[in-house]
Amino acid sequence: MTTIVSVRRNGQVVIGGDGQATMGNTVMKGNVRKVRRLYNDKVIAGFAGGTADAFTLFELFERKLELHQGHLTKAAVELAKDWRTDRMLRKLEALLAVADETTSLIITGNGDVVQPENDLIAIGSGGPYAQAAARAMLENTDLSAREIAEKALNIAGDICIYTNHNVNFEEISSKE
């Protein structure tokens, strides 16, 4: 598994993820890039789950974004519909955290598209640890979205054996 966290604060949204890929109880690779920019760098996305499955979903999601001229929610709903109803796609095991300058969403294989409370997303095996840490920082500090995401991933990496400290981030600032 992994940890992906998305934090939105003061006109900035950040998605960060660790780099560990495991097979069973063995670390296969420590520098997987699980966070990407999509649709002309206007959308950022991170995945938790099977790497090959996630790359397939990134490609499909980017096609949906192009089809719907970058409308994040519409593209997410259409991907979730296909993911749930297509026999081959149904077998893909991953979660996606996606964001543009105004909206953050979680997309699942059961057809769910969820806009989380407080625009805070944390998915993967270390998600609960990262979410608790990020929520505490959002409510009690003036740290930036990037600083909160970094610290939340660091805490998750200290606790979750399927999360490492080799993290990467993508961020978007609103034009306000």
Swiss-Prot record:
Activity regulation, per record: Allosterically activated by HslU binding.
GO annotation, biological process: proteolysis involved in protein catabolic process
| Top EC class of this enzyme | hydrolase
Enumerate the GO terms in the molecular function aspect. Answer: metal ion binding; threonine-type endopeptidase activity
Reactions catalysed according to its record: ATP-dependent cleavage of peptide bonds with broad specificity
Predominant cellular place of this UniProt entry's protein:
cytoplasm
Give the top-rank taxon of the lineage listed in the UniProt record for this protein: Bacteria
Active-site residues, as the UniProt record annotates them = T2
Q: What is its EC number?
A: 3.4.25.2
Q: Which GO terms describe its cellular component?
A: HslUV protease complex; proteasome core complex
Q: Could you tell me the keywords of this UniProt record?
A: Allosteric enzyme, Cytoplasm, Hydrolase, Metal-binding, Protease, Sodium, Stress response, Threonine protease
Chain residues that bind Na(+): G157, C160, T163
Where does the record place it? Cytoplasm
Subunit note: A double ring-shaped homohexamer of HslV is capped on each side by a ring-shaped HslU homohexamer. The assembly of the HslU/HslV complex is dependent on binding of ATP.
Function recorded in the entry: Protease subunit of a proteasome-like degradation complex believed to be a general protein degrading machinery.
Q: Which family does it belong to?
A: Belongs to the peptidase T1B family. HslV subfamily.
Please name the NCBIfam families in this protein's record.
Answer: ATP_dep_HslV, PRK05456.1
**HAMAP family assigned to the protein according to its UniProt record, in alphabetical order:** HslV
Q: Which PANTHER family match?
A: ATP-DEPENDENT PROTEASE SUBUNIT HSLV, METALLOPROTEASE TLDD
Q: What is this protein called?
A: ATP-dependent protease subunit HslV
The organism named in the record is Proteus mirabilis (strain HI4320)
